[in-house]
């Protein structure tokens, strides 16, 4: 989304080219939501759309290429992290227990046909800040290299992602509870114990 639509509300219609390099990712989500809405509006099927934002926590697979399992696996294997671009891209992170509570609230009490953002809008942190937090947890320096985006990586990667969860707060009394630092610490400790380092 453009900067004026971040934090992003459920009502935001998107800013994606249907033939752009990210289309396979974004359009597949859009198709899923469209099908749910069609069944709701035409067939009376009770549906909701849940839009999760960067859910993380223990139990993620080491082969998952999202930032936390990817970084931790490389660190365990003593392999420098690869930071695409400047490292100033920002994201928010929602711990798994907070996400699951949000999902359940939507399933049980969501207004049929409505979409709900599930995430934790605070804090919005950069990739470099995340690395510093991991360093503090591990008690050691983490090596990393800033590299260009590979050709296989979709272009137009958003510089910021942050949900507006005011609708969920108002309608479903949803409040993320787990501080991101605590969540990252528990997650990294779990990864250290169970990851084999595949890199």
For the regions a language model picked out, list residue spans one by one.
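Non-catalytic, hydrophobic alpha-helical segments
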Residues: 99, 103, 118, 130, ...
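Catalytic helix-loop patch of NAD(P)-dependent Rossmann-fold dehydrogenases
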Residues: 2-49, 54, 61-64
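Glycine/proline-rich active-site loop of Rossmann-fold NAD(P)-dependent oxidoreductases
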Residues: 30, 55-70, 79, 84, ...
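Amphipathic terminal alpha-helices
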Residues: 166, 180-199
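Hydrophobic alpha-helix immediately C-terminal to the catalytic Tyr-X-X-X-Lys motif of short-chain
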Residues: 31, 35, 39, 71, ...
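A short C-terminal helix-loop "cap" of Rossmann-like NAD(P)-dependent dehydrogenase/epimerase domains
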Residues: 10-16, 44, 71-83, 137-149, ...
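C-terminal "lid/loop" region of Rossmann-like NAD(P)-dependent oxidoreductases
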Residues: 86, 113-116, 128-131, 139-160
């Amino acid at each position: 989304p453009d900067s004026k639509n971040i934090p992003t509300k459920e009502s935001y219609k998107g800013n994606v080219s249907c033939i752009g390099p990210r289309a396979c990712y974004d359009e597949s989500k859009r198709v899923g939501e469209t099908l749910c809405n069609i069944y709701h509006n035409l067939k009376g099927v009770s549906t909701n759309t849940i839009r999760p934002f960067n859910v993380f926590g223990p139990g993620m697979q080491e082969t998952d290429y999202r930032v936390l399992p990817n970084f931790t696996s490389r660190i365990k294997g003593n392999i420098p992290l690869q930071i695409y671009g400047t490292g100033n891209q920002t994201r928010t992170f929602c711990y798994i227990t907070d996400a699951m509570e949000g999902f359940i609230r939507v399933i049980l009490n969501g207004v049929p046909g409505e979409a709900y953002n599930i995430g934790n809008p605070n804090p919005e942190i950069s990739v470099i800040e995340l690395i510093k937090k991991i360093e503090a947890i591990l008690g050691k320096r983490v090596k990393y290299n800033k590299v260009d985006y590979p050709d296989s990586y979709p272009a137009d990667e958003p510089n910021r992602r942050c949900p507006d969860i005011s609708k969920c707060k108002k309608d479903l009394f949803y409040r993320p509870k787990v501080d991101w630092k605590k969540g990252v610490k528990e997650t990294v400790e779990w990864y250290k114990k169970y990851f084999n380092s595949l890199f």
